[in-house]
């Protein structure tokens, strides 16, 4: 590997070879690489960046997504193709030639300046606003789409569930995940009945919402830069809401409105989608006791014109933004959804061993919404190398362990269990139940008795009897009628 002092000389020489660039702060060693500051004068635009080069260059930064040289300036957050940390987002072709790749990346930066700084190009895909979130803490609220029924200036209460409250890493960084449950106007998030039931067993709190309709952008700033101070946000909020918030913060909001000494306010606005638009929501945290609003008494003349006794002014304090993510079903399974004929079916899986547990997980990851699993057996150590269970599941029934796993994968799954063999039931009654409630049966029991039962009942559901032969030499899938007779062709 090249000596570090020689690498610094090489980097400086390459930068100086482009007359549009000027080194403002000399290239120097840092942990894991090299850094400096450069200025670029290009097409009449004058910009400056911190430049960071990994010591492995021309290889990429370790643990990064194809990033090699970083050009960074937080003042440019809000412009197109700028990451949350202020770095320019582009992915250069991989090249093992140091000089050639370095000069190419300088050209890529120029291309970004032309397209996104000067021409202010807008990409087809919507770019979410980047907010300055609270340091040393991570809060994220998850939600689903609604039916676009909110009106500008509408405000009220919403409910959310504290899904997890954990500490991460050696520094024990607090990581909190929340799921929105719905609004006080009976608009509910579209989680499955099973998942919503579990959410309601958690610590549930109330927050406030305000529908802005338009993005909360800083005015007279190049690009789409998010508002960062309360007095700027005041231009988007009605006096009625500020009065509601002022009185609530003084006395009306009880402990049910605070989690970890913070009140949650979500602000909603329209963003485009492939059909028309949808509502996006951003999270703001208000610390208990924080003095955000001042009430000013109006003169008599002002009272008549404004029909109010007070006007409410927000302070210039920095907004404490959390983060949010829309995980609506359409997004959650956007890249891996199975055909709707499968996902919309009511499915019964008989047998939750190696085959049944794996099939169940594949179906759930593919977007299946309604599932019943059946198995009478418990989990033993020898099951773990073949089936989708872990050490904590041992001793317990297979259905219990599998349901726990499946529910941890999808918030859109309704799942039920049967902990007994199918021969436990009266077959005539079982047939009536299956014909009414089940569309597809996957028999993964590898039990000939199960094919006897299915043949006897002759259910209307589509039936697939699956098995793996001894020593895992073959996978067998039998469907249709006369399952027992067909199975004998393979196993006798």
Set out the residue ranges of the language-model regions:
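A structured beta-alpha segment of the ubiquitous adenosine-cofactor-binding alpha/beta core
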Residues: 403-438, 445-448
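Domain-level detector for trafficking modules
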Residues: 81-136
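Glycine-rich adenosine-cofactor-binding loop
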Residues: 338-378
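Adenosine-phosphate binding glycine-rich loop
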Residues: 468-492
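Glycine/serine-rich phosphate-binding loop and adjoining beta1-alpha1 elements at the start
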Residues: 134, 146-344
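Structural motif
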Residues: 346, 439-440, 462
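Compact alpha/beta protein-protein interaction domains typified by the UBC
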Residues: 22-91, 99-103
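Glycine-rich phosphate-binding loop and adjoining beta1-alpha1-beta2 segment
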Residues: 376-412
